[in-house]
Amino acid sequence: MRGGAHGPGDRAGRCREHRQDHAGPCAGAGAPFARPAGHAGGRVPARVLRRARPHAAARGTGRHRRRAMASHRGRRAGRSHRAGRHHAADDRGLQRVRVRRPQSLPPGARAPAPLRPHAADRPRPGLAARRPAARRRPGARPGRPLGPRRAGLCRAALFGGLWRRLGAHGSRCGCAAPAAAPARPGGPRARRPAAAWPLPRMPAARMRTSVVRVRGEAPIAMSEPDSSSPPAHPPRPIRSFVLRAGRMGSGQTRALAELGPRFVLPFQREPLDPQTVFGRRAPRVFEIGFGMGDATAQIAAARPDTDFIGCEVHTPGVGALLKQIGERELTNLRIVQHDAVEVLDHMIEPGSLAGIHLFFPDPWHKKKHHKRRLVQPAFVERLVTRLAPGGYLHCATDWQPYAEQMLEVLGAEPALRNSADGYAPRPEYRPLTKFEQRGLRLGHGVWDLVFTKHQGRSASKQCTATSSP
């Protein structure tokens, strides 16, 4: 460490050679800690030494020391207006010393030049200022954050030149604004006609030409989408169910792992072969939405000469029915865990079912959700095509408005015939389900509808909707 003309200085700013306080080269910039302005002689106060102590010489690591000093400066922020700042330099770096500002300087003395503060005391630029200039929004201040770029795309990338020509590129998309065109020598740049603006791309089969008249200009031929042609992609079908997460018991999990490979049929786009699936050819009944499978297992156990295919999307219900299959040792029951509409379209052959069970489907109580109800005219037509002549369709619900809709839709199908005058009594083969027992406890009624597919489609029928007591 270098000092003044007499020798290196100590922590108090005194010359180590003379061991006394004096003004001279020893108190210059070469000393490790120069005596602040306003202290002509004597020892430097201890509080000043504590502020001026180097971080590396402090107890512990420099990171903890800087944190402690930063918190101390925060507590003394209230007195910052009465204190000045003086900087001292040594070979270890730049430190900032907080001393009291003197009222006046001695004659001939000059205030010390301010030095660059320590890195911990320098203000850090904002996040937007540290970002590259290419991602900065035009006209944004350095300290303000940029708007989020959603999904990595912007409006200009989605709509191409049309968005830039409409002058909407100054949004928060984060893209660079298009460069302005150079001014022409003859005058300002003329505006391009509206007919020259590019339009979004669309297949030629779906475009039709129409004439649009713009004020002050000649008629312009523009292309519009043709609503008469079919859309490029088919609309997404409305699902009648919502997958919800449910708990799986240990017995259901074990049954799903042990019996699933044998009794759960994977979805395929080819019709099922009953000889391969059941090992025989017998009447088949298709059940839509068996829930936890209690009623399905009882019906399959009571009718061993009939093969049953249950369709369910919820995994806990599939595991519960597999557990029932293992306990009852059923061999005439299989499960498909998939959407029933797609299963009917691809896995069930037309005219191959002896019966269809639809017990207590989701009623979708709200009016805006009635479109999600399973019993709709289009779905009933699909069911009729899969029924064999003389096959039956058995529906049950505990929601009276839904029962009325079922009776109306099924009665309007010309290929079905009601087996009763209105609602039918509960057949002997159908046991009380969990939903039915809950409805009876709440005082709700239960309505069964049994329709059969007659031999000739030209036969006429009339159904009278009456409520059973």
UniProtKB/Swiss-Prot annotation:
It holds the Pfam family Methyltransf_4. Its EC number is 2.1.1.33. Pathway: tRNA modification; N(7)-methylguanine-tRNA biosynthesis. It catalyses: guanosine(46) in tRNA + S-adenosyl-L-methionine = N(7)-methylguanosine(46) in tRNA + S-adenosyl-L-homocysteine. Residues 1-221 are annotated as: Unknown. Residues 23-47, 106-117, 140-150 have a biased composition (Low complexity). Substrate binds at K366, D398, T433, K434, F435, E436. Keywords: Methyltransferase, S-adenosyl-L-methionine, Transferase, tRNA processing. The active site is at D362. Residues 1-150 are annotated as: Disordered. GO terms for molecular function: tRNA (guanine(46)-N7)-methyltransferase activity. Residues 222-469 are annotated as: tRNA (guanine-N(7)-)-methyltransferase. Residues 8-22 have a biased composition (Basic and acidic residues). Residues 48-86 have a biased composition (Basic residues). S-adenosyl-L-methionine binds at E287, E312, D339, D362. GO terms for cellular component: tRNA methyltransferase complex. Belongs to the class I-like SAM-binding methyltransferase superfamily. TrmB family. This is tRNA (guanine-N(7)-)-methyltransferase. It comes from Methylibium petroleiphilum (strain ATCC BAA-1232 / LMG 22953 / PM1). The gene is trmB.
